[in-house]
């Protein structure tokens, strides 16, 4: 391309003048004029929190039945919740194993009852079986 006739060749300026010209060009705009980073996020739907199922309310209800005057700390409640999850996981694994051994496609109350007898020790297993039987009877009668 040929240079335009109206343009003059660029003049060389001293270094100090160049620095003085660059500083105003680098100024940041005022904070009031900036758009917030989340301006576009208002249009998007907010993620709903994942609901986590816990046994905390049931633990608390049982505690109040047994000892109405005693409370429980949140850390202790978390430990109890983990304990119940672990026990239920062991019972589920054992009942699943029993169903597989007996070549049954379904886990019934009988597999659960046998798993309780295998997983829980002595007297605790007896009480759990009697309470479980009572709960199943109550459920089927309604």
Curated annotation (Swiss-Prot):
Record-level GO cellular component terms: nucleosome; nucleus
PTM sites of type N6-acetyllysine: 7, 33-34
Location in the cell: Nucleus; Chromosome
Keyword Nucleus: yes
A Pfam family annotated for this UniProt entry: Histone
InterPro entries linked: Histone-fold, Histone_H2A/H2B/H3, Histone_H2B, HISTONE_H2B_site
Keywords: Acetylation, Chromosome, DNA-binding, Isopeptide bond, Nucleosome core, Nucleus, Ubl conjugation
The organism's place on the tree of life at top rank: Eukaryota
Induction: By gibberellins GA1, GA3, GA4 and GA9.
Region (Disordered): 1-51
Crosslink (Glycyl lysine isopeptide (Lys-Gly) (interchain with G-Cter in ubiquitin)) position: 138
SS bond list: none
GO molecular function, one term: DNA binding
Ranges annotated as biased composition (Basic and acidic residues): 8-42
Membrane-spanning intervals of the chain: none
PTM section of the record: Can be acetylated to form H2BK6ac, H2BK33ac and H2BK34ac. Monoubiquitinated to form H2BK143ub1; may give a specific tag for epigenetic transcriptional activation.
Tissue and organ distribution: Ubiquitous. Highest level in shoots, fruits and young flower buds, including petals, anthers and ovules.
Gene3D superfamilies assigned: Histone, subunit A
Protein role: Core component of nucleosome. Nucleosomes wrap and compact DNA into chromatin, limiting DNA accessibility to the cellular machineries which require DNA as a template. Histones thereby play a central role in transcription regulation, DNA repair, DNA replication and chromosomal stability. DNA accessibility is regulated via a complex set of post-translational modifications of histones, also called histone code, and nucleosome remodeling.
Subunit text: The nucleosome is a histone octamer containing two molecules each of H2A, H2B, H3 and H4 assembled in one H3-H4 heterotetramer and two H2A-H2B heterodimers. The octamer wraps approximately 147 bp of DNA.
PANTHER family cross-referenced by the UniProt entry: HISTONE H2B
Family: Belongs to the histone H2B family.
Record protein name field: Histone H2B.1
Organism: Solanum lycopersicum (Tomato)
